[in-house]
Amino acid sequence: MPKRKVSSAEGAAKEEPKRRSARLSAKPPAKVEAKPKKAAAKDKSSDKKVQTKGKRGAKGKQAEVANQETKEDLPAENGETKTEESPASDEAGEKEAKSD
């Protein structure tokens, strides 16, 4: 396979090959990092729309957390009622009655 002929003057002038388009060879403009301005009234409504999109349906771990929260609010299974606080108050009342 023959080697390419490269003259030193021609190689230094052209950094990129000819087959590359102007769109690809053009360097992207430098990004200016400006501080975001406070949202106007119109922008706030669009922010609310974005938040509602996130509330459509929980996926993965988020769904598990949501399910646990709802289960805590519901009464116990098989018709049992939650009696976490009432036994403690009954015991305290019995102890006071015994000490009298």
UniProtKB/Swiss-Prot annotation:
Residue list for modification N6-acetyllysine: K14, K27, K82
Region of interest: Disordered: 1-100
Protein localization: Nucleus; Cytoplasm
An example Gene Ontology CC term for this record: nucleus
The keyword DNA-binding belongs to this UniProt entry's keyword annotation: yes
Keywords from the UniProt entry: Acetylation, ADP-ribosylation, Cytoplasm, DNA-binding, Nucleus, Phosphoprotein
Example of a GO biological process term: regulation of transcription by RNA polymerase II
Modified residues (Phosphoserine): S8, S21, S25, S86, S89, S99
Annotated Basic and acidic residues bias: 30-50, 69-85
Residues with the ADP-ribosylserine modification: S7, S25
GO MF annotation terms: chromatin binding; DNA binding; nucleosomal DNA binding
Residues recorded with modification Phosphothreonine: T81
Cross-referenced Pfam families: HMG14_17
Database matches in InterPro entries: HMGN_fam (IPR000079)
Post-translational modification, as annotated: Phosphorylation on Ser-21 and Ser-25 weakens binding to nucleosomes and increases the rate of H3 phosphorylation. Phosphorylation favors cytoplasmic localization.
Subunit structure: Interacts with transcriptional regulator SEHBP.
Assigned protein family: Belongs to the HMGN family.
Biological role stated in the UniProt entry: Binds to the inner side of the nucleosomal DNA thus altering the interaction between the DNA and the histone octamer. May be involved in the process which maintains transcribable genes in a unique chromatin conformation. Inhibits the phosphorylation of nucleosomal histones H3 and H2A by RPS6KA5/MSK1 and RPS6KA3/RSK2.
Name this protein carries in UniProt: Non-histone chromosomal protein HMG-14
Species in which this protein is naturally found: Homo sapiens
Gene: HMGN1
